[in-house]
Every structure is written in structure tokens, then in C-alpha cells.
């Protein structure tokens, strides 16, 4: 970065390591997004085994490209680096910080047995176990890799290691985590989990080597990060019980803050990354990717996303009796069924691509409602739902989410909420704001509010009832097809 006058604005360099791409932003200390760049990387998958892996070196290359792109804008002086990443994923590294194998990402299903075993031993489930089930799987199934591994890290922690040279396990205030003795008894050496640091604290300073690789000055404070979903909560402006959000993105999901713990089958329930609150919600598998799948794989990429959504908007609510199940990669919350598959139901000659596109968009909203239904039944009350990510750029998509769920919907000023959340965490870490709630309140804004249309409630209630019944109805047939029995 070229030298600048003292009057240059102070900014945070925020790195959001998502499932399909990294987003890097320059964010002002009042929350304005001044520059954004992104770069992608592939995922290696094998549906037969449940494998889903990525190359950590590909992450670093993508980060380097994106950082250099935003730094060319010269919009300000970087005073901190904030981090978040997808998860629960696992990166195994040696003593020098080099990966000993590909990263096992959250879509990988090979460690389900280890997940259950760790849950039984610790009382923790879901995100609270981080990448530990995958680490235990590596210890049991890949002894050569395990022997070469010094540290098991989350995605955001491996970025901090690469930037500063310091291994650490970043945990939110009050976040439960298994103790080393319990891990040892299960066969996962607790010594391979780095010492804990508080998310939002300074891990270290940017090393000269990392600074040269990224094209920025050394010595910038690097702040301990968190999972992208939690960063998105911060970036969306969630502060109070009843604040909810849909993170958008490749998977889709729903999360809400509440004032007490809730036990909801099929959903995660843990502390919130804010003291005194609890977080409950679920992440789907591929609802956000379904529109792109249809646009690229089925239609051959002949339309832009905007043009396809315009066609979807030209069809009636309910897509003239067409319903879509968005389980293109199995489903996580609330079904937790990796064998689930997608389906169009009710298809006829009267349906065109606009109908199919609308059915896919409506299915993403139905999936949110499916997760939220159990949470509301357990006692939570949704005050508003903030919609984020790429889908929130579409007025149609936002309105459909309001209509289908019945929730008041708010659109944040910065849709890249994980980027914004990483910046909020980093700004707090260097003392730019007195505390995290103040930073969230001061660095997040709402630009649009949408209300559900009451005249569509009965229609979408009927659709949701059909949506819930459809998966159990066709699941036996789907399994027969997968097993070659039909």
C-alpha cells in the first residue's frame, strides 16, 4: 500500500472466507463498505463417500488476489485485519503451519459417527464441536496425516496463523468447548488444539512474510475471528432477543437470538456471540445455490440471474401449482438427511422456466420457514428477519421471503454481512468502539423494510403444508433409486 497523508480514513481489512469464494472488504469504522473484491476456489467432492475438501493454499492464493484488488483503490489506511470463515470445517497443519492434508469442510459427512461420539461425551452438538469430529476422524482413519499434524484449526484460525505465525483457537465470550482431557480419552490429542483466545482480541501483528504476500504493510493488528454465520449476525445488526436473520449465501439458513436456551430438534442451539443472549438456528445445504444450478446447469447460462428472477416475478405466487424441494446436496436443518434429493412436483406443460425459477425461489423461503417453525414452537418470537447475501439484492426474493414466512423483513445497507461482521469485530478489538454492542449498533444500518402481504398468507400456508409432507412421502423412493433398487 502506498504511503498516505495523516488525513486518510482509517479502515479495516475484512476477510470473509466463504464456502465457494473469499470476499475481502475495506470497511470504514462507521460501517461503510468502501471496496470489495472476491475470488473463488473449488471444492473436491465424492458423494459416494461423503467427502468434501478444499485446498488451504487455494484459499491463500484467492485472498492474495482479493486483497491486492481492494488495496489498489487506496481508499484508506488499514488499521486492523478482521477474519471469519466457513465452518464447522477443519484444517490440519504441521509445526510450520503447512497443511498436512486438504481441509475437510462443513459439507463433508464422513465424521458423523465421531460427531455423535463427541456429543455424547461432551454434551455439545453442532457448531459447538467445531471441526473436532473431523479431527477425530483423521486420527482414526489417516494415521500418517495425524502423525504429521501439530495443530487442528478452524478456517479463521488458520488464516490468523498464516498472517501472524501464532496458533490459537478463537472462541466467543462464554463459548463452551471440550477440554483437553475429554479429547484425550476419545483418542484426539488435546495438545493438538491450540490455546484459546477470545474472539475479537488481537492475536498478533501481520508478519513481514504475510505482508509481502498480500501487498500491505507489516505490523497491522490481526484480530481473532469467528465462524461466518456469527460474523453475519454482527454485520446484520443483530443485538436483541427476537432479532433474526437469513444469511443467504450458498447454503441458506435461519438464526435468531433469544433470552434463554431453546432445545429444538434439527436446529443448533448455543450461546450467542453476544453476552446474555442465546443463538438458535439451522443451516440448510444448498438452497442458495439452487437458482444458479438451474440457471447454469439446466438453462446453460443463457440468462443472467437478474433476467431469470425477472421471469420468476412474472409468474403468480405459488408458480401455478408447482413446488420444488431444494435438497440438491441432501439437507441439513431441520431434516439432517444426506440422502434427501431435490424434486419438482406438480410439473405440467403449462409451466415454463419462469415457473420453475419462481418455485426454486419460493422453496428457499419455505426452507427458512421449515427451520423457523420449530424454533417459534419452542418459544421464540421473531421481531424482524434481516436478509443478507446475494439473494437480498432481489426485491422479488426478499418479498417472497416475507410472504412465505410471515416475518417482517429488513434489508441491511451492507449485504455482505460476514465482511461487515469481521470488520465490526476487528474495530472493537483495536478499541475503535467501546464494546461489541456499540460497534454493532454504530456500524450496521437498514436500507429497506418489507412486510408480508396478508392476501397471500392462506396460499403459502397450504404450500408449506405440502412442502413439509413431501420429503417423507418421496424419501423411500429416492433411497431406492440411490441404491439401484428401482
Feature locations, PLM:
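N-terminal glycine/serine-rich phosphate-binding loop of ATP-dependent small-molecule kinases
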Residues: 1-101, 148, 212, 216, ...
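Gly/Ser/Thr-rich active-site cleft segment
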Residues: 17-19, 122-227, 329, 357, ...
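Active-site nucleophile and cofactor-binding loops and adjacent substrate-binding regions
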Residues: 54, 80-85, 104-107, 126-131, ...
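A short helix-loop
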Residues: 132-144, 161-166, 182-186, 190, ...
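ATP-dependent carbohydrate kinase catalytic cores
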Residues: 176-275, 286, 303-306, 310, ...
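Glycine-rich phosphate-binding/hydrolytic loop that grips phosphoryl groups
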Residues: 232-235, 284-285, 292-295, 362, ...
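Acidic, glycine/GT-rich loop-and beta-edge segments that sit at the periphery of enzyme/chaperone cores
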Residues: 262, 431-486
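Activation-segment/catalytic-loop signature of the eukaryotic protein kinase fold
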Residues: 318-411
